[in-house]
C-alpha cells in the first residue's frame, strides 16, 4: 500500500482539526455542555494520535453521548471552582487584610493549580476509561501526580501559555476560533497517549475506539 503524500496528509490533518474545532465550539455554545464537548474533543484527538485517522464527526458525537453524564457533572464542578477561585482571589487582593493578602493569594493559586492539573487529566480519562465518577477523579489525580514530570508539567505549561497568549493577542484568539482548541488538544494528547498506551494498549486493536 503506497504511502500518502506528506502534503496531502498535512492538509487532511488541518481540515480535520478545523472541522473538530468548529464542532467543539458549536457544542460549547450552551455553556453547560462544555464538559461533554471537551471530553469528546479528547476522544477524537487521542484516537487520531493512535490511529492517525479522521472519523471526526462520528467519534466526537459518540463520545459526547456516551460520556455526557460524567462530563456534564465534571464541567459544572469545574465552572463552579473557577468562579469560587476568582471570587477568592478578588477578595484577598482587594478586600482582605493587607498582611494576609499575599499569603492567601499564593495559597489560592497553588490550590488552583493542583485542581487544574487534575482537570487536565480528568477529561481524557473519562474519554478513555469506563468507571464510576469517583474512580475517574481518583485515577486522574493519581496520573497527574505520578506523571507530573514530564507529562503533567508540559501539558499544564502548554495550556497556560495558550491561555496567556489568548488573553494578550487578538491573533491567538483568531487562531483559537479557527482551529486552536482542536490543535491544543491534539498536541496535549501526545503526552496523554504515552500514559494510556502503557495502561491500555498492550496490543494494537482496531476495535478500541474509545
Task: Please annotate each region the language model reported.
Residues 1-6:
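Short, Lys/Arg-rich, polar N-terminal cytosolic tail immediately upstream
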Residues 12-22, 63-80, 125-163:
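Interfacial aromatic "cap" segments that immediately flank transmembrane helices
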Residues 13, 56, 68, 97-102, ...:
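Membrane-helix interface segments
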Residues 24, 28, 85-90, 162-166, ...:
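Structural signal for membrane-spanning alpha-helices in multi-pass inner-membrane proteins
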Residues 24-46, 99-131, 172-199:
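Selective recognition of hydrophobic, aromatic-rich stretches within alpha-helical transmembrane segments
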Residues 38-66:
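Interfacial loop at the N-terminal end of multi-pass membrane proteins
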Residues 71-114:
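Helix-adjacent hinge/juxtasegments
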Residues 201-210:
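Single conserved hydrophobic/aromatic residue that forms the stacking wall/gate
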Amino acid at each position: 500500500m503506497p504511502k500518502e503524500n506528506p502534503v496531502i496528509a498535512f492538509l487532511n490533518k488541518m481540515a480535520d482539526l478545523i472541522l473538530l474545532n468548529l464542532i467543539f465550539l458549536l457544542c460549547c455554545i450552551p455553556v453547560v455542555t462544555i464538559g461533554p464537548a471537551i471530553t469528546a474533543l479528547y476522544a477524537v484527538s487521542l484516537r487520531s494520535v493512535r490511529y492517525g485517522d479522521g472519523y471526526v464527526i462520528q467519534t466526537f458525537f459518540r463520545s459526547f453521548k456516551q460520556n455526557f453524564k460524567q462530563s456534564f457533572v465534571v464541567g459544572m464542578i469545574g465552572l463552579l471552582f473557577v468562579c469560587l477561585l476568582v471570587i477568592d482571589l478578588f477578595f484577598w487582593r482587594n478586600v482582605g487584610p493587607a498582611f494576609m493578602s499575599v499569603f492567601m493569594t499564593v495559597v489560592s493559586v497553588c490550590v488552583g493549580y493542583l485542581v487544574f492539573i487534575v482537570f487536565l487529566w480528568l477529561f481524557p480519562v473519562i474519554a478513555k476509561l469506563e468507571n464510576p465518577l469517583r474512580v475517574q477523579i481518583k485515577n486522574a489525580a493519581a496520573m497527574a501526580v505520578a506523571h507530573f514530570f514530564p507529562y503533567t508539567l508540559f501539558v499544564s505549561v502548554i495550556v497556560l501559555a495558550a491561555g496567556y497568549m489568548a488573553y494578550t493577542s487578538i491573533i491567538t484568539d483568531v487562531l483559537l476560533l479557527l482551529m486552536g482548541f482542536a490543535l491544543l488538544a491534539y498536541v496535549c494528547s501526545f503526552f496523554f497517549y504515552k500514559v494510556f498506551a502503557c495502561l491500555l494498549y498492550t496490543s494494537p486493536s482496531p476495535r478500541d475506539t474509545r
